[in-house]
């Protein structure tokens, strides 16, 4: 007995030691040499990209004044067959200069939220050179696009070296860039002059629009960031060196094969290092930087990142870089929920039980952007759906694979989630509601958004020209998610994953367009998808199919009437349910109605169109089925419950003042 007791104590003590060690915070240190990587990218992937814009940035940041002093050396290489005597630049930070830029006109900046680049010098070929601004649509207040005029053409293979010396004050955060009030936390993105994209003899370099993202070429980055000694820096890429002096530290980051660089600076954050082992045995370092008040979320953040890495490796493709960095931002920061190569920002509510799928969905969504558009770098200004739509679709797949999806919930007092359905609320007090665990069906969140904007704009429309933020959001996020889910259900899940894997392998480190994906899908599945993209990509037709009648026309003969009530077309399945079996037919004709004839000796119960819900854009699934004998008990049950809710609501409202 004594031996058993002693052994039990030993095991408990050992377990406590293991748990304690596991909970210990990590120290953010340089990663050191690794034979599997070169400057942050797997050796195997170095040949997958062509460096076009390479940057060497030396940064000094003063957290007190929020001032960045930067020396930048950019080497741009003409990898095209076309000559150019200009180099265009994005000056995204100038979007915060005043309230008349395309970006700031939406946000109405105050004085603490404004900033702009202040150049001390711009050098080309050891000579000073001037920036020339290009004002889109005559907006002289928007200086987010500029170019330098070269004295001669750069031909294929030629390069140009431009050196910038400038300063930039980090503003109070409004969106994506800035410091958090009340905390020594600054997130710095879109902060340096960055070359546009030269394609087919033209420069693509658009202004910074309020809710759109970016477009730039791949290259190699070397960045040194000097901060006071008590501060820490996390960034795109691998930390290769940390130098300290009496009062300051310099963090050196290298990263090959990316098209942007972002970083944060803070003196109060929890760091946890995790690792993910690929199937080939190589290791990805997961850097988790979490606010002290959200320490309890570290494990959920970690699991979400690892699940995402595993899903991509198993289904689409390897994450090719040495590290991935998650940054949990303060509550007062407006930079959460954004992605950059190798780093992304998240946050979490004070109350976020597991069933809400927050912050899991946010983490998975932002990680997925590492592939779309971190690696498959489409033009987000023109075709935002290629990254936002694909990301929304894949993030939802990951959530349902690893977590089973979330439960329906509503919030009391804005922040406290309650599982169930809320039908009526008065001053944040639920009046008509039900408390029940209901799994949210896949795609439902996107459907709710899509219903708010059925016909304004198409997915094919140029993103920055869509007339409202809602039409942009629906045609970039929710509708493409539903279209991709419909495509998956039409061609099959396995075929969809093969298609995405091929899309990734063919276009990683490139700038594909929508037609590249559409043509690849047609190439794999044949011309049977022509109608699909015509309906869902080029048009904004509303879909609603219904079964409106079942008639017995003879001995063992039945007719089912199916109707297309709106303009949208889909190739549908028609099924007839009997007490013994289920009979199937196809409806592929583009007609408004069709009568389907069935022969069966069994008792007919009902008929249904699209029983597997392949068409996720059908606006009314309730009319998809038709029963021979009406069933009233469900209606009576719902009606009685509804009357009970109304009675409660009237009693509560009647007691108010």
Predicted regions and their residues:
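N-terminal, polar/Ser/Thr-rich
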Residues: 15-69, 182, 530-531, 535
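A surface-exposed beta-strand-loop module
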Residues: 26, 67, 77, 107-184, ...
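Hydrophobic alpha-helical and helix-loop surface patches within well-folded domains
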Residues: 32, 253, 288-562
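Solvent-exposed beta-hairpin/edge-strand motifs
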Residues: 86-129, 230, 577-582
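Extended, low-hydrophobicity, Ser/Thr/Pro/Gly-biased non-transmembrane segments
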Residues: 112-115, 161-268, 610, 647-656
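Coil residues (strongly favoring Ser/Thr
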Residues: 143, 159, 244, 268, ...
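Beta-strand-rich binding/interaction modules
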Residues: 235, 529-530, 543-545, 550-612
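Extracellular/periplasmic ectodomains of large secreted or surface enzymes and adhesion receptors
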Residues: 549, 605-657
């Amino acid at each position: 007995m004594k031996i058993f007791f002693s052994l039990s104590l030993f095991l408990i003590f050992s377990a406590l030691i293991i748990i304690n060690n596991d909970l210990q915070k990590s120290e953010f240190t340089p990663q050191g040499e690794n034979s599997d990587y070169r400057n942050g990218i797997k050796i195997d992937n170095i040949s997958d990209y062509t460096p076009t814009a390479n940057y060497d940035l030396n940064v000094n940041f003063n957290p007190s004044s929020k001032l960045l002093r930067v020396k930048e050396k950019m080497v741009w290489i003409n990898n095209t067959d076309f000559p150019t005597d200009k180099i265009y630049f994005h000056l995204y930070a100038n979007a915060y200069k005043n309230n008349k830029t395309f970006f700031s006109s939406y946000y109405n900046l105050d004085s603490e939220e404004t900033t702009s680049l202040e150049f001390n010098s711009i050098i080309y070929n050891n000579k000073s050179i001037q920036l020339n601004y290009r004002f889109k649509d005559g907006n002289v207040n928007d200086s987010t696009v500029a170019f330098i005029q070269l004295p001669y053409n750069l031909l294929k293979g030629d390069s140009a070296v431009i050196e910038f010396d400038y300063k930039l004050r980090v503003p109070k955060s409004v969106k994506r860039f800035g410091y958090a009030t009340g905390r020594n936390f600054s997130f710095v993105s879109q902060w340096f002059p960055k070359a546009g994209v030269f394609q087919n003899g033209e420069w693509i370099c658009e202004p910074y629009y309020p809710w759109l993202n970016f477009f730039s070429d791949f290259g190699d980055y070397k960045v040194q960031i000097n901060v006071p000694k008590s501060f820490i820096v996390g960034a795109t890429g691998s930390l290769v060196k940390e130098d300290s002096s009496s009062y300051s530290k310099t963090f050196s980051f290298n990263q090959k094969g990316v098209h942007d660089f972002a970083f944060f600076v803070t003196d109060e954050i929890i760091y946890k290092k995790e690792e993910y082992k690929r199937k080939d045995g190589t290791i990805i370092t997961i850097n988790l930087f979490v606010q002290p008040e959200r320490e309890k979320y570290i494990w959920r953040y970690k699991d979400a990142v690892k699940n995402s890495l595993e899903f991509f490796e198993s289904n689409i493709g390897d994450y090719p870089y040495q590290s991935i960095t998650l940054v949990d931002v303060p509550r007062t920061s407006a930079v959460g929920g954004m992605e950059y190569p190798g780093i992304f920002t998240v946050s979490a509510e004070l109350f976020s039980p597991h069933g809400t799928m927050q912050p899991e969905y946010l983490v998975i969504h932002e990680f997925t952007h590492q592939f779309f558009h971190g690696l498959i770098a489409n033009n987000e200004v023109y075709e935002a759906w290629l990254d936002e739509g694909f990301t929304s679709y894949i993030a939802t797949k990951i959530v349902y694979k690893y977590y089973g999806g979330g439960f329906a919930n509503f919030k009391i007092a804005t922040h406290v989630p309650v599982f169930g359905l809320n039908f009526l609320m008065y001053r944040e007090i639920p009046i008509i509601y039900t408390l029940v665990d209901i799994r949210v069906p896949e795609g439902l969140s996107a459907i709710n958004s899509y219903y708010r904007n059925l016909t304004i704009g198409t997915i094919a429309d140029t993103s920055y020209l869509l007339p409202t933020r809602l039409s942009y959001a629906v045609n970039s996020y929710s509708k493409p998610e539903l279209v991709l889910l419909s495509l998956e259900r039409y061609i099959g899940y396995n075929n969809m994953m093969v298609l995405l894997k091929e899309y990734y392998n063919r276009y990683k480190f490139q700038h594909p367009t929508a037609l590249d994906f559409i043509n690849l899908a047609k190439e794999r599945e044949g011309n049977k998808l022509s109608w699909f993209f015509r309906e869902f990509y080029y048009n904004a037709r509303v879909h609603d199919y219904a079964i409106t009648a079942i008639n017995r026309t003879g001995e063992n003969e039945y007719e089912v009437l199916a109707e297309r009530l709106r303009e949208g077309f889909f190739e549908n399945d028609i099924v007839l349910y009997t007490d013994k079996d289920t009979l199937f037919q196809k409806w592929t004709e583009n007609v408004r109605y069709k009568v389907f004839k069935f022969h069966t000796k069994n008792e007919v119960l009902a008929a249904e169109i699209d029983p597997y819900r392949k068409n996720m854009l059908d606006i009314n699934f309730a009319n998809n089925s038709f029963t021979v004998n009406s069933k009233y008990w469900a209606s009576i049950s719902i009606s009685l419950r509804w009357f009970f809710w109304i009675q409660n609501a009237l009693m509560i409202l009647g007691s108010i003042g």
